[in-house]
Amino acid sequence: MKFATIILLAGLMAARGAEVTARPTAEFLDSIGVDTTFPDRGQPLEKTIEMIRYGGFRWVRGGIEGLTEHGPTTLRTYLELHERTGVKFSWGLVSGGTDLEKLLGTARELAEAGALLAFEGNNEPNNWGVKYKGEDGGGRAKSWLAVAKLQRDLYAAVKGDAVLRKYPVWSISENGAEVDNVGLQFLTIPTGAGTLMPEGTRFADCANVHNYIYHPASPHPMDNKTWNAAEPGPACKVDGLYGNYGRTWGRHFAGYSESELASLPKVTTETGCTIDGEVTEEMQGLNLLSMYLDQFKRGWNHTSVYLLRDRTDEGGNQSFGFFDRDYTPRKAALYLHNLTTILGKGEGGREGAAEELNYTIDGETGTVHDLLLENSAGVFQLIVWDERLTGKDEVTVKLNGKKDSVVVYDPTAGVKAVWAGEWASEIGLTLSNHPVVVEIGALR
Protein backbone atom coordinates (compact mmCIF):
# COMPACT_ATOMS: atom_id res chain seq x y z
CA MET A 1 0.00 0.00 0.00
CA LYS A 2 1.27 3.48 -0.81
CA PHE A 3 0.18 6.78 0.70
CA ALA A 4 -0.57 9.85 -1.36
CA THR A 5 0.62 13.29 -0.32
CA ILE A 6 -0.35 14.38 3.17
CA ILE A 7 -1.64 17.95 3.01
CA LEU A 8 -0.04 20.04 5.73
CA LEU A 9 -0.41 23.61 4.47
CA ALA A 10 -1.45 25.99 7.22
CA GLY A 11 -3.61 28.14 4.98
CA LEU A 12 -5.94 25.41 3.74
CA MET A 13 -9.63 25.89 4.43
CA ALA A 14 -11.04 23.28 6.84
CA ALA A 15 -13.06 20.56 5.15
CA ARG A 16 -16.76 20.52 5.89
CA GLY A 17 -17.45 16.97 6.96
CA ALA A 18 -19.93 15.08 9.07
CA GLU A 19 -19.76 14.78 12.83
CA VAL A 20 -19.31 11.09 13.59
CA THR A 21 -19.58 9.74 17.12
CA ALA A 22 -16.74 7.39 17.93
CA ARG A 23 -17.36 4.00 19.48
CA PRO A 24 -15.03 2.79 22.23
CA THR A 25 -12.08 0.82 20.92
CA ALA A 26 -12.56 -1.63 23.78
CA GLU A 27 -16.08 -2.36 22.54
CA PHE A 28 -14.75 -3.47 19.17
CA LEU A 29 -11.92 -5.49 20.69
CA ASP A 30 -14.37 -7.15 23.08
CA SER A 31 -16.43 -8.29 20.08
CA ILE A 32 -13.57 -10.44 18.76
CA GLY A 33 -14.10 -14.09 19.66
CA VAL A 34 -13.07 -17.56 18.54
CA ASP A 35 -14.16 -21.18 18.66
CA THR A 36 -11.46 -23.52 19.93
CA THR A 37 -10.61 -27.09 20.83
CA PHE A 38 -9.95 -28.09 24.45
CA PRO A 39 -7.87 -30.88 26.07
CA ASP A 40 -10.65 -33.46 25.63
CA ARG A 41 -10.00 -33.17 21.89
CA GLY A 42 -6.23 -33.19 22.11
CA GLN A 43 -5.27 -29.50 22.39
CA PRO A 44 -3.18 -28.71 25.51
CA LEU A 45 -4.29 -25.72 27.55
CA GLU A 46 -0.83 -24.14 27.46
CA LYS A 47 -0.90 -24.04 23.66
CA THR A 48 -4.43 -22.62 23.68
CA ILE A 49 -3.31 -19.84 26.01
CA GLU A 50 -0.40 -18.96 23.70
CA MET A 51 -2.65 -18.78 20.64
CA ILE A 52 -5.37 -16.75 22.39
CA ARG A 53 -2.81 -14.22 23.59
CA TYR A 54 -1.20 -13.94 20.17
CA GLY A 55 -4.45 -13.26 18.35
CA GLY A 56 -5.79 -10.84 20.94
CA PHE A 57 -9.11 -12.65 21.27
CA ARG A 58 -11.40 -11.32 24.00
CA TRP A 59 -13.94 -14.14 24.27
CA VAL A 60 -14.26 -17.85 23.55
CA ARG A 61 -17.29 -19.94 22.71
CA GLY A 62 -17.62 -22.56 25.43
CA GLY A 63 -20.10 -24.91 27.02
CA ILE A 64 -20.77 -28.11 28.85
CA GLU A 65 -20.07 -30.54 26.01
CA GLY A 66 -16.95 -32.56 26.87
CA LEU A 67 -16.86 -31.00 30.35
CA THR A 68 -16.32 -33.55 33.13
CA GLU A 69 -15.39 -33.47 36.79
CA HIS A 70 -12.12 -35.35 36.31
CA GLY A 71 -11.04 -34.15 32.89
CA PRO A 72 -9.20 -33.86 30.67
CA THR A 73 -11.44 -30.77 30.21
CA THR A 74 -12.87 -29.48 33.49
CA LEU A 75 -14.36 -26.21 34.64
CA ARG A 76 -10.93 -25.42 36.01
CA THR A 77 -9.65 -25.53 32.40
CA TYR A 78 -11.93 -22.62 31.52
CA LEU A 79 -11.17 -20.72 34.71
CA GLU A 80 -7.43 -20.96 34.12
CA LEU A 81 -7.84 -19.83 30.52
CA HIS A 82 -9.73 -16.78 31.82
CA GLU A 83 -7.22 -16.05 34.58
CA ARG A 84 -4.25 -16.15 32.22
CA THR A 85 -5.70 -14.41 29.16
CA GLY A 86 -8.68 -12.38 30.40
CA VAL A 87 -11.10 -14.01 27.93
CA LYS A 88 -14.74 -14.47 28.83
CA PHE A 89 -17.00 -17.29 27.68
CA SER A 90 -20.33 -17.69 26.03
CA TRP A 91 -21.72 -20.73 27.82
CA GLY A 92 -23.92 -23.14 25.98
CA LEU A 93 -25.59 -26.52 25.82
CA VAL A 94 -23.61 -27.08 22.60
CA SER A 95 -24.52 -30.01 20.32
CA GLY A 96 -27.49 -32.02 21.58
CA GLY A 97 -27.10 -30.95 25.20
CA THR A 98 -30.12 -30.70 27.51
CA ASP A 99 -28.66 -30.56 31.04
CA LEU A 100 -29.87 -27.17 32.27
CA GLU A 101 -28.85 -27.89 35.85
CA LYS A 102 -25.24 -28.48 34.80
CA LEU A 103 -25.30 -25.45 32.52
CA LEU A 104 -26.44 -23.07 35.24
CA GLY A 105 -24.35 -24.63 38.00
CA THR A 106 -21.11 -24.27 36.07
CA ALA A 107 -22.12 -20.81 34.85
CA ARG A 108 -22.44 -19.57 38.43
CA GLU A 109 -18.80 -20.43 39.04
CA LEU A 110 -17.77 -18.66 35.84
CA ALA A 111 -19.83 -15.62 36.83
CA GLU A 112 -18.21 -15.50 40.27
CA ALA A 113 -14.79 -15.43 38.57
CA GLY A 114 -15.86 -12.66 36.15
CA ALA A 115 -15.51 -15.08 33.23
CA LEU A 116 -19.10 -15.33 31.97
CA LEU A 117 -20.21 -13.38 28.90
CA ALA A 118 -23.58 -14.88 27.90
CA PHE A 119 -25.62 -18.06 27.56
CA GLU A 120 -26.14 -19.84 24.25
CA GLY A 121 -28.84 -22.27 23.16
CA ASN A 122 -28.32 -25.51 21.29
CA ASN A 123 -25.76 -25.69 18.50
CA GLU A 124 -27.35 -26.44 15.12
CA PRO A 125 -30.23 -28.72 16.20
CA ASN A 126 -30.78 -29.59 12.55
CA ASN A 127 -27.48 -31.47 12.68
CA TRP A 128 -27.56 -32.55 16.33
CA GLY A 129 -31.07 -33.24 17.54
CA VAL A 130 -32.14 -33.19 21.19
CA LYS A 131 -34.15 -35.45 23.44
CA TYR A 132 -35.81 -33.30 26.09
CA LYS A 133 -38.24 -34.62 28.67
CA GLY A 134 -38.82 -37.72 26.56
CA GLU A 135 -39.51 -35.80 23.35
CA ASP A 136 -37.25 -35.82 20.28
CA GLY A 137 -36.67 -32.57 18.41
CA GLY A 138 -34.48 -31.36 15.57
CA GLY A 139 -32.24 -33.78 13.73
CA ARG A 140 -34.43 -36.33 11.94
CA ALA A 141 -37.43 -35.76 14.20
CA LYS A 142 -40.69 -34.60 12.65
CA SER A 143 -40.94 -31.58 14.95
CA TRP A 144 -38.80 -28.93 16.62
CA LEU A 145 -41.13 -28.51 19.60
CA ALA A 146 -38.65 -30.18 21.95
CA VAL A 147 -35.94 -27.74 20.82
CA ALA A 148 -38.28 -24.78 21.40
CA LYS A 149 -39.36 -25.99 24.84
CA LEU A 150 -35.76 -26.51 25.89
CA GLN A 151 -34.79 -23.01 24.76
CA ARG A 152 -37.84 -21.55 26.52
CA ASP A 153 -36.87 -23.32 29.73
CA LEU A 154 -33.22 -22.27 29.41
CA TYR A 155 -34.28 -18.64 29.14
CA ALA A 156 -36.68 -18.89 32.09
CA ALA A 157 -34.07 -20.63 34.25
CA VAL A 158 -31.43 -17.97 33.59
CA LYS A 159 -33.81 -15.06 34.15
CA GLY A 160 -35.15 -16.69 37.32
CA ASP A 161 -31.68 -17.01 38.85
CA ALA A 162 -30.61 -14.18 41.16
CA VAL A 163 -26.96 -14.45 40.09
CA LEU A 164 -27.36 -15.16 36.38
CA ARG A 165 -30.35 -13.07 35.32
CA LYS A 166 -28.18 -10.11 34.27
CA TYR A 167 -26.45 -12.15 31.55
CA PRO A 168 -27.91 -12.17 28.03
CA VAL A 169 -29.28 -15.35 26.51
CA TRP A 170 -28.37 -16.02 22.88
CA SER A 171 -30.71 -18.13 20.80
CA ILE A 172 -29.98 -21.47 19.18
CA SER A 173 -28.13 -21.53 15.86
CA GLU A 174 -29.65 -22.63 12.55
CA ASN A 175 -33.23 -22.01 13.62
CA GLY A 176 -33.89 -21.37 9.93
CA ALA A 177 -33.96 -25.16 9.54
CA GLU A 178 -37.03 -25.70 11.75
CA VAL A 179 -39.42 -28.13 10.03
CA ASP A 180 -42.54 -26.88 11.80
CA ASN A 181 -43.37 -23.33 12.82
CA VAL A 182 -42.45 -23.52 16.51
CA GLY A 183 -41.48 -19.82 16.54
CA LEU A 184 -37.72 -19.98 17.07
CA GLN A 185 -37.32 -17.32 14.37
CA PHE A 186 -38.31 -14.85 17.10
CA LEU A 187 -36.64 -13.81 20.34
CA THR A 188 -40.11 -13.36 21.84
CA ILE A 189 -43.08 -14.67 19.86
CA PRO A 190 -45.25 -11.65 18.93
CA THR A 191 -49.01 -11.44 18.88
CA GLY A 192 -50.54 -12.94 15.75
CA ALA A 193 -47.45 -14.90 14.70
CA GLY A 194 -49.44 -18.11 14.28
CA THR A 195 -46.70 -20.33 15.72
CA LEU A 196 -47.02 -23.66 17.51
CA MET A 197 -45.53 -22.22 20.69
CA PRO A 198 -47.80 -19.60 22.29
CA GLU A 199 -47.59 -15.85 21.81
CA GLY A 200 -45.30 -14.22 24.35
CA THR A 201 -42.96 -17.21 24.63
CA ARG A 202 -39.49 -15.85 25.34
CA PHE A 203 -36.52 -17.66 23.85
CA ALA A 204 -33.59 -15.24 23.88
CA ASP A 205 -32.29 -11.70 24.19
CA CYS A 206 -30.15 -11.95 21.09
CA ALA A 207 -30.25 -13.65 17.70
CA ASN A 208 -27.49 -16.15 16.95
CA VAL A 209 -26.24 -16.92 13.43
CA HIS A 210 -23.61 -19.09 11.71
CA ASN A 211 -22.96 -16.90 8.69
CA TYR A 212 -19.95 -18.61 7.13
CA ILE A 213 -18.31 -16.48 4.47
CA TYR A 214 -18.62 -19.01 1.64
CA HIS A 215 -21.86 -20.85 0.92
CA PRO A 216 -23.31 -22.92 -1.94
CA ALA A 217 -25.27 -19.82 -2.96
CA SER A 218 -22.09 -17.71 -2.91
CA PRO A 219 -19.12 -20.06 -3.36
CA HIS A 220 -16.51 -17.78 -4.90
CA PRO A 221 -14.40 -14.80 -3.78
CA MET A 222 -15.92 -11.48 -4.81
CA ASP A 223 -15.94 -7.79 -3.97
CA ASN A 224 -17.46 -7.08 -0.54
CA LYS A 225 -17.47 -10.78 0.27
CA THR A 226 -17.54 -10.41 4.05
CA TRP A 227 -19.58 -7.20 3.97
CA ASN A 228 -22.33 -9.24 2.32
CA ALA A 229 -22.00 -12.08 4.83
CA ALA A 230 -22.70 -9.53 7.58
CA GLU A 231 -25.74 -8.11 5.72
CA PRO A 232 -28.84 -8.34 7.97
CA GLY A 233 -31.42 -8.32 5.16
CA PRO A 234 -32.41 -10.53 2.22
CA ALA A 235 -29.48 -9.31 0.09
CA CYS A 236 -27.23 -11.58 2.15
CA LYS A 237 -26.03 -14.43 -0.06
CA VAL A 238 -24.98 -16.80 2.74
CA ASP A 239 -26.66 -18.38 5.77
CA GLY A 240 -27.26 -15.03 7.44
CA LEU A 241 -29.67 -13.23 9.71
CA TYR A 242 -32.52 -13.00 7.22
CA GLY A 243 -32.67 -16.73 6.49
CA ASN A 244 -32.93 -17.53 10.19
CA TYR A 245 -34.95 -14.62 11.59
CA GLY A 246 -36.60 -12.94 8.59
CA ARG A 247 -37.93 -15.82 6.51
CA THR A 248 -36.56 -19.20 7.47
CA TRP A 249 -34.44 -20.85 4.81
CA GLY A 250 -35.95 -24.31 5.33
CA ARG A 251 -39.75 -23.94 5.24
CA HIS A 252 -39.96 -20.14 4.73
CA PHE A 253 -41.77 -19.34 7.97
CA ALA A 254 -42.21 -15.59 8.47
CA GLY A 255 -40.19 -13.84 11.15
CA TYR A 256 -39.07 -10.24 11.58
CA SER A 257 -39.45 -7.54 8.94
CA GLU A 258 -36.40 -6.08 7.23
CA SER A 259 -36.64 -2.92 9.34
CA GLU A 260 -36.84 -4.98 12.53
CA LEU A 261 -33.85 -7.09 11.51
CA ALA A 262 -31.72 -3.98 11.07
CA SER A 263 -31.87 -3.25 14.80
CA LEU A 264 -32.28 -6.80 16.13
CA PRO A 265 -29.63 -7.66 18.76
CA LYS A 266 -27.41 -10.24 17.09
CA VAL A 267 -24.25 -12.28 17.48
CA THR A 268 -22.33 -14.80 15.42
CA THR A 269 -21.03 -17.89 17.19
CA GLU A 270 -19.53 -19.43 14.05
CA THR A 271 -18.19 -17.94 10.84
CA GLY A 272 -14.98 -18.36 8.90
CA CYS A 273 -13.61 -20.09 5.82
CA THR A 274 -11.28 -22.89 4.83
CA ILE A 275 -8.16 -22.59 2.73
CA ASP A 276 -9.20 -24.42 -0.40
CA GLY A 277 -9.23 -23.78 -4.14
CA GLU A 278 -9.64 -20.06 -4.81
CA VAL A 279 -9.34 -19.27 -1.11
CA THR A 280 -5.61 -19.08 -0.43
CA GLU A 281 -4.00 -18.52 2.96
CA GLU A 282 -3.71 -14.82 2.05
CA MET A 283 -7.39 -14.65 1.07
CA GLN A 284 -8.43 -16.34 4.31
CA GLY A 285 -6.38 -13.85 6.31
CA LEU A 286 -7.95 -10.87 4.54
CA ASN A 287 -11.46 -12.34 4.82
CA LEU A 288 -11.25 -12.96 8.56
CA LEU A 289 -9.80 -9.52 9.24
CA SER A 290 -12.57 -7.74 7.33
CA MET A 291 -15.25 -10.06 8.75
CA TYR A 292 -14.65 -8.82 12.30
CA LEU A 293 -14.79 -5.21 11.07
CA ASP A 294 -17.89 -5.71 8.91
CA GLN A 295 -19.78 -7.49 11.65
CA PHE A 296 -19.12 -4.74 14.18
CA LYS A 297 -19.88 -1.98 11.68
CA ARG A 298 -23.18 -3.64 10.73
CA GLY A 299 -24.41 -4.05 14.29
CA TRP A 300 -23.27 -7.49 15.43
CA ASN A 301 -22.39 -7.37 19.13
CA HIS A 302 -20.01 -10.32 19.15
CA THR A 303 -18.39 -12.45 16.45
CA SER A 304 -16.69 -15.80 16.93
CA VAL A 305 -14.66 -17.31 14.10
CA TYR A 306 -14.32 -21.05 13.64
CA LEU A 307 -11.53 -22.04 14.34
CA LEU A 308 -8.52 -21.17 16.49
CA ARG A 309 -6.46 -24.17 15.32
CA ASP A 310 -7.12 -26.90 12.78
CA ARG A 311 -8.78 -30.01 14.18
CA THR A 312 -6.56 -33.06 14.58
CA ASP A 313 -9.34 -35.48 15.55
CA GLU A 314 -11.53 -35.06 12.46
CA GLY A 315 -11.15 -35.94 8.79
CA GLY A 316 -11.90 -33.74 5.82
CA ASN A 317 -10.55 -30.31 4.97
CA GLN A 318 -9.16 -29.11 8.29
CA SER A 319 -7.91 -25.68 7.27
CA PHE A 320 -10.33 -23.35 9.06
CA GLY A 321 -7.78 -22.41 11.71
CA PHE A 322 -5.95 -19.21 12.49
CA PHE A 323 -3.20 -21.70 13.34
CA ASP A 324 -2.12 -24.84 11.52
CA ARG A 325 -2.30 -28.14 13.38
CA ASP A 326 1.40 -27.78 14.31
CA TYR A 327 0.54 -24.41 15.97
CA THR A 328 2.17 -22.35 13.23
CA PRO A 329 0.29 -19.04 12.88
CA ARG A 330 -1.27 -18.51 9.48
CA LYS A 331 -1.57 -15.06 7.92
CA ALA A 332 -5.03 -14.75 9.50
CA ALA A 333 -3.42 -15.00 12.94
CA LEU A 334 -0.63 -12.59 12.01
CA TYR A 335 -2.96 -9.95 10.57
CA LEU A 336 -5.34 -10.15 13.54
CA HIS A 337 -2.41 -10.01 15.96
CA ASN A 338 -1.22 -6.84 14.26
CA LEU A 339 -4.67 -5.22 14.28
CA THR A 340 -5.40 -5.98 17.94
CA THR A 341 -1.90 -4.84 18.91
CA ILE A 342 -2.27 -1.55 17.03
CA LEU A 343 -5.71 -0.86 18.47
CA GLY A 344 -4.73 -2.03 21.95
CA LYS A 345 -2.15 0.70 22.43
CA GLY A 346 -3.39 3.18 25.02
CA GLU A 347 -6.15 0.89 26.30
CA GLY A 348 -6.69 0.47 30.03
CA GLY A 349 -6.74 4.18 30.82
CA ARG A 350 -9.65 6.50 31.45
CA GLU A 351 -13.18 5.85 30.26
CA GLY A 352 -14.94 9.00 29.10
CA ALA A 353 -18.01 10.00 27.17
CA ALA A 354 -18.02 9.21 23.46
CA GLU A 355 -16.59 12.08 21.42
CA GLU A 356 -17.19 13.18 17.85
CA LEU A 357 -14.82 13.70 14.95
CA ASN A 358 -15.68 15.71 11.86
CA TYR A 359 -14.38 13.99 8.73
CA THR A 360 -15.28 12.90 5.22
CA ILE A 361 -13.74 10.32 2.89
CA ASP A 362 -13.57 11.55 -0.68
CA GLY A 363 -13.47 8.85 -3.33
CA GLU A 364 -15.21 6.31 -1.11
CA THR A 365 -16.63 3.61 -3.39
CA GLY A 366 -19.08 0.81 -2.62
CA THR A 367 -16.27 -1.45 -1.42
CA VAL A 368 -14.71 1.10 0.94
CA HIS A 369 -15.94 1.16 4.54
CA ASP A 370 -14.92 3.02 7.67
CA LEU A 371 -15.27 2.72 11.43
CA LEU A 372 -14.40 5.43 13.95
CA LEU A 373 -13.13 4.27 17.34
CA GLU A 374 -11.73 6.15 20.32
CA ASN A 375 -9.42 4.47 22.80
CA SER A 376 -9.32 5.09 26.52
CA ALA A 377 -6.41 7.51 26.09
CA GLY A 378 -8.69 9.78 24.04
CA VAL A 379 -7.05 8.96 20.69
CA PHE A 380 -9.29 8.54 17.64
CA GLN A 381 -8.62 5.41 15.59
CA LEU A 382 -10.25 5.64 12.17
CA ILE A 383 -10.22 2.28 10.41
CA VAL A 384 -10.70 2.48 6.65
CA TRP A 385 -10.85 -0.73 4.63
CA ASP A 386 -11.48 -1.82 1.08
CA GLU A 387 -12.93 -5.14 -0.06
CA ARG A 388 -11.93 -5.22 -3.71
CA LEU A 389 -11.03 -8.56 -5.22
CA THR A 390 -8.81 -6.76 -7.74
CA GLY A 391 -7.79 -3.17 -8.35
CA LYS A 392 -7.40 -0.16 -6.07
CA ASP A 393 -9.26 2.89 -4.80
CA GLU A 394 -7.67 6.28 -4.20
CA VAL A 395 -9.40 8.00 -1.27
CA THR A 396 -8.72 11.09 0.79
CA VAL A 397 -9.63 11.40 4.45
CA LYS A 398 -10.47 15.06 5.06
CA LEU A 399 -10.47 16.37 8.61
CA ASN A 400 -12.24 19.50 9.76
CA GLY A 401 -9.12 21.45 10.61
CA LYS A 402 -5.50 20.43 11.02
CA LYS A 403 -4.67 17.82 13.65
CA ASP A 404 -1.44 18.01 15.60
CA SER A 405 -0.66 14.33 15.15
CA VAL A 406 -1.70 11.75 12.55
CA VAL A 407 -0.22 8.23 12.41
CA VAL A 408 -1.09 5.53 9.87
CA TYR A 409 -0.77 1.77 10.36
CA ASP A 410 -1.23 -1.18 8.00
CA PRO A 411 -1.96 -4.42 9.92
CA THR A 412 -0.97 -6.54 6.92
CA ALA A 413 2.51 -4.96 7.06
CA GLY A 414 3.19 -5.06 10.81
CA VAL A 415 2.54 -3.15 14.02
CA LYS A 416 4.79 -0.15 13.34
CA ALA A 417 3.51 3.05 11.76
CA VAL A 418 3.88 3.28 7.99
CA TRP A 419 3.46 7.06 8.03
CA ALA A 420 3.38 9.78 10.68
CA GLY A 421 2.93 13.54 10.40
CA GLU A 422 1.93 16.70 12.24
CA TRP A 423 -0.69 19.34 11.52
CA ALA A 424 -2.39 17.31 8.81
CA SER A 425 -5.84 18.09 7.47
CA GLU A 426 -5.96 15.55 4.63
CA ILE A 427 -4.61 12.02 4.34
CA GLY A 428 -4.48 10.34 0.94
CA LEU A 429 -4.74 6.55 0.94
CA THR A 430 -4.44 3.92 -1.76
CA LEU A 431 -6.69 1.05 -0.72
CA SER A 432 -7.24 -2.43 -2.14
CA ASN A 433 -8.24 -5.41 -0.02
CA HIS A 434 -7.45 -4.74 3.65
CA PRO A 435 -7.77 -2.12 6.40
CA VAL A 436 -5.53 0.70 7.50
CA VAL A 437 -5.73 2.43 10.88
CA VAL A 438 -5.44 6.22 11.00
CA GLU A 439 -4.67 7.45 14.52
CA ILE A 440 -5.69 11.06 15.04
CA GLY A 441 -4.40 12.91 18.07
CA ALA A 442 -1.88 10.24 19.02
CA LEU A 443 0.90 11.17 21.41
CA ARG A 444 4.22 10.16 19.86
Model-found features: residue ranges?
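Hydrophobic h-region of N-terminal signal peptides that target proteins for export
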Residues: 6-17
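Aromatic-lined substrate-binding rim segments of carbohydrate-active enzymes
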Residues: 46-52, 59-116, 138-172
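Aromatic/acidic polysaccharide-binding cleft in carbohydrate-active enzymes
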Residues: 272-364
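Boundary/entry segment of secreted carbohydrate-active catalytic domains
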Residues: 18-66
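C-terminal beta-strand-rich structural cap/linker in extracellular carbohydrate-active enzymes
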Residues: 419-444
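Noncatalytic carbohydrate-binding groove/subsite architecture in carbohydrate-active enzymes
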Residues: 94, 100-108, 143-291, 298
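Carbohydrate-binding surface patches
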Residues: 358-404, 411
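Hydrophobic faces of well-ordered beta-strands that scaffold small-molecule active sites
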Residues: 30-36, 60-62, 87-93, 117-121, ...
